[in-house]
Amino acid sequence: MSSATTYIDVNAPVSDDIRSQIAGADNNALIVRLMFTTNHLSRWLTPIHDPNRLERSLYRGEPTAKELVIALRNEEQRVYPKMHLIATQTRANLDTLPEWQENPQSVERDTLQPTIVLMAQFRRLRQSTCGLLRSLPDDAWGLVGRSRREPDVTIRQLAERLAVTDYRYLRALDQTLDQVGARQGLAEIQKTHLDELLTLVPEHLTL
């Protein structure tokens, strides 16, 4: 992992190795990878009982742990409706979906919510995503959603994008928890870093 003084940038490049792992995973393994994200969050965040530890960053402009969880939830809210439309409608037109936008009321509500509640919201959304993916035969992963606003996309491509997004935000969260001292006093198993956790993710899985 990066040193404790590295500026944390969610949009830092994702290595070719990580991208290859995601692209090379079969559909079942990709579902497991997406579900593991909720496990990683629970492992890291549930033992931290002081909410202030999750709402601070080391440098100005860096995301807090809470902000990273919100971003993961928001991305799930953007992507799931697209997946569902493609899976349930012939010749799905993604432009019929309203563009997802964060409104001031939800921003204010998020400010008042504990990080653990926001994590639970993300978990419920991710469970819906994975439930949808599990219900699809392999050939349905290639179904395409059409759009004039953005490039056409398949269900598989959306799932891979979620996995890359997960990696970006989990990487930043792992670094943030270290840098702000949020893990002080926790058991070693609760401080396991992302690189080690990712070794548990299968690339191929036969069910």
Annotate each language-model stretch with its function.
Residues 20-27, 65, 108-115, 151-155:
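A short, mixed-charge helix-start or loop-turn motif at secondary-structure junctions
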Residues 9-26, 33:
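Secretory/endomembrane lumenal or extracellular ectodomains immediately following the signal peptide
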Residues 38-49, 77-80, 84, 123-137, ...:
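Structural signal for well-ordered, non-membrane alpha-helices
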Residues 33-34, 102-142, 157-162, 172:
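Acidic/histidine-rich alpha-helical segments that form the ligand environment
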Residues 2-13, 17, 52-101, 144-207:
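Short, contiguous alpha-helical
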Residues 24-53:
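Short, contiguous, helix-prone interaction/anchoring segments in small proteins
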Residues 25, 29-33, 57, 88, ...:
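Solvent-exposed interaction patches of small proteins and small membrane subunits
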